[in-house]
């Protein structure tokens, strides 16, 4: 028995590689043959290593035995005439975004962007997504703040789409992409209202006596109202203003002359343009009637009566009366004079000493 039996532990690994190949369609395959093929290529390497660390195991007494199996699978499929179906999801999104940018904003605004799924039952709206519990949430991205704005949760997808459309128009203007087109009622409301024609008020005029035609025309121009005023009380005020004015004449008993004319000269007219010195205001002063006889017009003999002692009757000094003739000869007056002379001498002496 010369056979060698290897009792080393065995480690088996398998490496699989898959790829897809596309071929042109043939008449046989179109008639009813299978169009899908799968080719597998297998190879086993008994002395293969998994990593560089396997060489270090040779130093051990019983190193492990490595067996590696390689499997290559090739799937052959017929090619498709429609190129879009063979494009990956990333390329498909890229193509859809580029097509949206090429469209004009006006056409995209009128066309509702409703997306129908493969099943054809659920509609997808822009900015609307469904929650796991069944409600619909709406959100929009603010281009200025560069963040998403939460719009709320709604029962139906249409309600959420309408809220998104309003927010998009508010943030991006009337040319923003919306889910629904603007109804014609709102467009009619946006039209300018018709201008209101204002009626001109009828002015009632009454004939007034005037001295000349030019004065009457000037008064009419002053009291005309503006064409835009339509108030009734304005016309009443105009009628009151246009009534004839009574000329204000001064009463006969009241004079409008200045204060220096009053009582002196009334024949110069009613104007106040004169100066005080223009009128002879001293005429009436000298033409007045002579006054009554005064004391100064009497002769001196009549003024002084027979009693010459009129000033010598009483002299009030300290509450006592005295006779002037007696007092002049009395010694008290002499004593008073001596006291004044002594006072003068003492005052002069004090001034000299100082």
From Swiss-Prot:
Q: Where in the cell is it found?
A: Cytoplasm; Nucleus
Segments of skewed composition (Low complexity): 205-215
| Organism ancestry | Eukaryota, Viridiplantae, Streptophyta, Embryophyta, Tracheophyta
- What are the BP-aspect GO terms? cotyledon development; cytokinin-activated signaling pathway; ethylene-activated signaling pathway; leaf development
Protein's name in the database: Ethylene-responsive transcription factor CRF3
Q: Where is the composition biased (Polar residues)?
A: 96-120
Question: Which species expresses this protein natively?
Answer: Arabidopsis thaliana (Mouse-ear cress)
Q: Pfam families attached here?
A: AP2 (PF00847)
Per the record, which residues fall in region Disordered? 85-120, 180-220
């Amino acid at each position: 028995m010369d056979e060698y039996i290897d009792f080393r532990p065995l480690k088996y690994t398998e490496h699989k590689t898959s790829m897809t190949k596309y071929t042109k369609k043939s008449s046989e395959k179109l008639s009813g043959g299978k169009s899908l093929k799968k080719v597998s290529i297998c190879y086993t390497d008994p002395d293969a290593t998994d990593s560089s660390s396997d060489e270090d195991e040779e130093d051990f007494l019983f190193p492990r035995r490595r067996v590696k199996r390689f499997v290559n699978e090739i799937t052959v499929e017929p090619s498709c005439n429609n190129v879009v179906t063979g494009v990956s999801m990333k390329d498909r999104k890229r193509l859809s975004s580029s097509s949206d940018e090429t469209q004009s904003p006006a056409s995209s605004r009128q066309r509702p962007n409703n997306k129908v799924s493969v099943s054809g039952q659920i509609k997808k709206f822009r900015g609307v997504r469904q929650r796991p519990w069944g409600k619909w949430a709406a959100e929009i991205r603010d281009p200025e703040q560069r963040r998403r704005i939460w719009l709320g949760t709604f029962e139906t997808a249409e309600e959420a789409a309408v809220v998104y459309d309003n927010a998009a128009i508010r943030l991006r203007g009337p040319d923003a992409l919306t889910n629904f087109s603007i109804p014609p009622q709102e467009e009619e409301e946006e039209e300018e209202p018709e201008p209101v024609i204002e009626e001109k008020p009828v002015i009632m005029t009454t004939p007034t006596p005037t001295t000349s035609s030019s004065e009457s025309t000037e008064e009419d121009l002053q009291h005309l109202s503006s064409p835009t005023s339509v108030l009734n009380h304005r016309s009443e005020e105009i009628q009151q203003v246009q009534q004839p004015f009574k000329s204000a004449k001064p009463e006969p008993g009241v004079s409008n002359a200045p204060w220096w004319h009053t009582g002196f000269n009334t024949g110069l007219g009613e104007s106040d343009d004169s100066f005080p010195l223009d009128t002879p205001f001293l005429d009436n002063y000298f033409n007045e009637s002579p006054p009554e006889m005064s004391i100064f017009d009497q002769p001196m003999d009549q003024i002084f009566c027979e009693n010459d002692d009129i000033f010598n009757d009483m002299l009030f000094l300290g509450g006592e009366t005295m006779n002037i003739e007696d007092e002049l000869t009395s010694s008290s007056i002499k004593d008073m004079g001596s006291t004044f002379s002594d006072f003068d001498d003492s005052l002069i002496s004090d001034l000299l000493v100082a």
